């Protein structure tokens, strides 16, 4: 399960309410919120260990039933303004990737987990996707802090996170849904750091 960032920020009541509203209102042509129609496609993608093995917070075992529950749970959290599970579709309308934004509105903070279908990995689109997701969390959701983790041996994700300008802050224990833990690399970035890095 996700844990809020190590660095503690306190949102004002107005900021917290705005973040919750932004999460609840997200979606549209450019951002497809996962629904029942995506269960089979997500299951097929996540059943591939090349996709799912590095990700600690996926439902296990990966079955259509567990993925359907995960989508339902994510939607319930979206209605509270605390989570957003989205899918990327390819030209044929098949699930090509997913992103799950976990949001702590009271902390003005968020994290993202996600993956691309195995046949689309190493296509150099990962860094662009990370940049889009960062912009979305800061500009659309309105959080002031993003925290990210990656498995110690997940070289590809670590390289993308480093390249995006996140600060490495050591290691943390990530807790899986079954209660077991995984040692993870840990990064943070503030909105101010992102603005400085990306100012034209």
Show which residues each predicted segment covers.
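Conserved GNAT-fold acetyl-CoA-binding loop/helix
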Residues: 52-73
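Generic structural signal for secondary-structure transition and capping sites
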Residues: 50-51, 76-79, 142
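A short helix-loop-beta-strand connector motif used in the catalytic cores of GNAT acetyltransferases and
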Residues: 73-87
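Short gly/ser-rich anion-binding loops that grip negatively charged ligand groups
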Residues: 57, 61, 81-82, 89
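Acyl-donor (CoA/ACP) binding surface of acyl/acetyltransferases
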Residues: 1-49, 88-200
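Short, hydrophobic secondary-structure boundary micro-motifs
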Residues: 53-55, 83, 197-198
């Amino acid at each position: 399960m996700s844990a809020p960032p190590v660095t503690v920020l306190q949102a004002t009541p107005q900021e917290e309410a705005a973040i919750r509203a932004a999460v609840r209102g997200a979606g549209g042509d450019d951002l497809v919120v996962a629904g029942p129609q995506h269960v089979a496609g997500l299951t097929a993608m996540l059943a591939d260990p090349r996709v799912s093995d590095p990700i600690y917070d996926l439902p296990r075992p990966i079955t259509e039933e567990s993925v359907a529950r995960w989508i339902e749970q994510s939607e319930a959290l979206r209605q509270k303004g605390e989570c957003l599970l989205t899918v990327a579709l390819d030209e044929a309308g098949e699930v090509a990737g997913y992103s799950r934004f976990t949001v702590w509105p009271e902390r003005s903070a968020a994290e993202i987990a996600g993956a691309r279908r195995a046949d689309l990995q190493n296509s150099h689109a990962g860094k662009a996707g990370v940049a889009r997701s960062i912009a979305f969390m800061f500009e659309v959701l309105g959080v002031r802090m993003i925290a990210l983790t990656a498995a110690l041996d997940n070289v590809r994700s670590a390289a993308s996170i480093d390249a995006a300008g996140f600060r490495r802050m050591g290691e943390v224990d990530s807790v899986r849904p079954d209660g077991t833990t995984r040692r993870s690399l840990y990064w943070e970035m503030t909105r101010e750091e992102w603005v400085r890095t990306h100012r034209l």
